[in-house]
Amino acid sequence: MDTARVYFGLKPPRTPGAWHESPPSLPPDACRCPRSHRLALKLSCAGLILLVVTLIGMSVLVRVLIQKPSIEKCYVLIQENLNKTTDCSAKLECPQDWLSHRDKCFHVSHVSNTWEEGLVDCDGKGATLMLIQDQEELRFLLDSIKEKYNSFWIGLRYTLPDMNWKWINGSTLNSDVLKITDDTENDSCAAISGDKVTFESCNSDNRWICQKELYHETLSNYVGYGH
């Protein structure tokens, strides 16, 4: 009896990684663009950005040019308003019953009272007791006052403990404008009487002279005031 021959087809053993083989790779130049194409793409992007920036700049320039006439018109209107304001300031006048001299208005009271009451009355009129600027202004007031026999308080007072004459704005008396040579007593206030300036007790009853300015000026501009 012939022995049966059995042949087994032997297959080589599979390695562990053989079950997960990677797909075959594509050719190197299958999905790559030529270098010249990439350069053209970059240049196109740069050109597009430059175009957008240029359009934005032109739109801003057009807007400025459109608004320029309006800005110039506003400037002209502002200048006209400033000129009108200047003209109005030049036409300011003193209130009725006030004396006008240079850039000041003066009011002579019709009643008599103490120096302090005169100060309060002037303040209620939006003014102050008279502050003499120079000899010319003093001469104008002396010539304008008809009642030569009366005394009129002004904004000058003898202060303690300084023992000095001071205007109500705090500046000291300038002797080039006014000179008070008499011995001064405590609690003395200055008054215009006749053709000179005298001093009396601040509690005396006198009329007074108020002043206000037509234009805004700082009191430091007055040469009649010391510092």
Swiss-Prot record:
Positions on the Extracellular side per record topology: 67-227
InterPro entries membership: C-type_lectin-like (IPR001304), C-type_lectin-like/link_sf (IPR016186), CTDL_fold (IPR016187), KLR_subfamily_B (IPR051527), NKR-like_CTLD (IPR033992)
Transmembrane segments: 46-66
Localisation: Membrane
Domain C-type lectin: residue ranges: 93-212
Keyword Transmembrane: yes
GO cellular component terms, semicolon-separated: plasma membrane
Segments on the Cytoplasmic side according to the record's topology features: 1-45
Origin: domain of life: Eukaryota
SMART domains per record: CLECT (SM00034)
Description of how the protein assembles with itself and partners: Homodimer; disulfide-linked. Interacts with tyrosine kinase LCK.
Function: Plays a stimulatory role on natural killer (NK) cell cytotoxicity.
Name the record gives this protein: Killer cell lectin-like receptor subfamily B member 1A
Species assigned in the record: Mus musculus (Mouse)
Name of the gene encoding the protein in the UniProt record: Klrb1a
